[in-house]
């Protein structure tokens, strides 16, 4: 599980670098906020198209191959981005990231975790996975911010040079950990060969039809969708703080990285709550409390 956590945790910091360095990205790549949003929209579309086949792919190929491909692919795409290419090439990079962090990663990551976890501890293991990923991402983001601040303030390379150093750091970490994960997972029981009695393409379509007609899956999808809408709002926090409140790039990064350190705690708590409490009522309370109007109303009543 630790290898899965570290492996997946090295991928997302550079893919979602916007949450800490939005203003610096706009300046370095000479693009507008709308163009950066277009890149992330492309990323979301690729995710939509690849999440479903990623599950099928994880049944056909070993986890270590898929995750290693994801890490090395993400790393080299990051090195390409560090050259500050034209906007058209940046969009190609985000398409590539959609493949390396969606198609080849997600299904393998979920399958690997579910195989490791005992039946009565699934929630706990997935909570540890999310918490561990959050810890790795927060740690890498903190180091990335330190690298950015060092090159900006001590070396004096300017915003573009400092962000380039951060991108190189993220890319090399993902590439460097690839052989460790690849060889360490070689003896894992997750690498069992595919079942020779598994059904072919006709069975795949029957399974897909069964999934699409399951109401619980659609309800779970709606819950995830709502949760991600709240999650995506936080991605614009860096740009808001820098453009509206006129905070420096380093100060903004410190605030957004501090938010990332809350994720490990939340992941662990969510996993244990999933094992010991009723999940649906608890999700309802969380979604309601996350609504900004609910928070403002509560604050208003409290002040009265």
Language-model segments: what does each one mean?
Residues 49-87:
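Conserved MFS/SLC helix-loop-helix module at the cytosolic interface between two early adjacent transmembrane helices
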Residues 104-118, 304:
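Intracellular juxtamembrane helix-capping segments at the cytosolic ends
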Residues 126-149:
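Glycine-rich segments within core transmembrane alpha-helices of 12-TM secondary carriers
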Residues 50-62, 266-279:
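Helix-to-loop junctions at the C-terminal end of transmembrane segments
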Residues 60-71, 275-288:
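Cytoplasmic membrane-interface "Motif A"-like loop-to-helix N-cap segments
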Residues 72-86, 288-303:
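C-terminal ends and interior cores of transmembrane alpha-helices
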Residues 185-206:
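Flexible cytoplasmic inter-helical loops of multi-pass small-molecule transporters
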Residues 18-22, 141, 214-257, 267:
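Extracytoplasmic gate region of multi-pass secondary transporters
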